[in-house]
Amino acid sequence: MAILGLGTDIVEIDRIEAVISRSGDRLAKRVLSANEWAQYQAHQQPVRFLAKRFAVKEAAAKAFGTGIRNGLAFNQFEVFNDELGKPKLRLWDEAERLAARMGVTSVHVTLADERHYACATVIIES
């Protein structure tokens, strides 16, 4: 196994809250997968939920070395939790095809949030 990429991102939660205040759910609809959207709508702290997902997806785009462009979209990275609560990343569409082309066999995610910030790190391996 070899590390193919590493990405880290930090999000100021107040900035996400300001965007939601200005433009409603537009950002959430652009960033979240269908499964994440359902969780967001039911979540007790939707701003924190969105900030954490945004951080993971930015970190993933950095780990893949592509950013969000050329057919790659935020909603193609889906954050979910395993049975123990560990965050995982599911890839869809172009993100899944890119991972296959790169020979990705494992994606590791770590996620943390505090009062003002959400941060995430994503490591991809072959």
From Swiss-Prot:
It catalyses: apo-[ACP] + CoA = holo-[ACP] + adenosine 3',5'-bisphosphate + H(+). It comes from the Bacteria. The keyword rRNA-binding does not apply. Gene3D superfamilies: 4'-phosphopantetheinyl transferase domain (3.90.470.20). Pfam families: ACPS (PF01648). GO terms for molecular function: holo-[acyl-carrier-protein] synthase activity; magnesium ion binding. It is found in: Cytoplasm. Its cofactor is Mg(2+). Its main location: cytoplasm. One of its GO terms (biological process) is fatty acid biosynthetic process. Its EC number is 2.7.8.7. Mg(2+) binds at D9, E58. Keywords: Cytoplasm, Fatty acid biosynthesis, Fatty acid metabolism, Lipid biosynthesis, Lipid metabolism, Magnesium, Metal-binding, Transferase. GO terms for cellular component: cytoplasm. It is an enzyme of class 2 (transferase). Transfers the 4'-phosphopantetheine moiety from coenzyme A to a Ser of acyl-carrier-protein. Belongs to the P-Pant transferase superfamily. AcpS family. This is Holo-[acyl-carrier-protein] synthase. The gene is acpS.
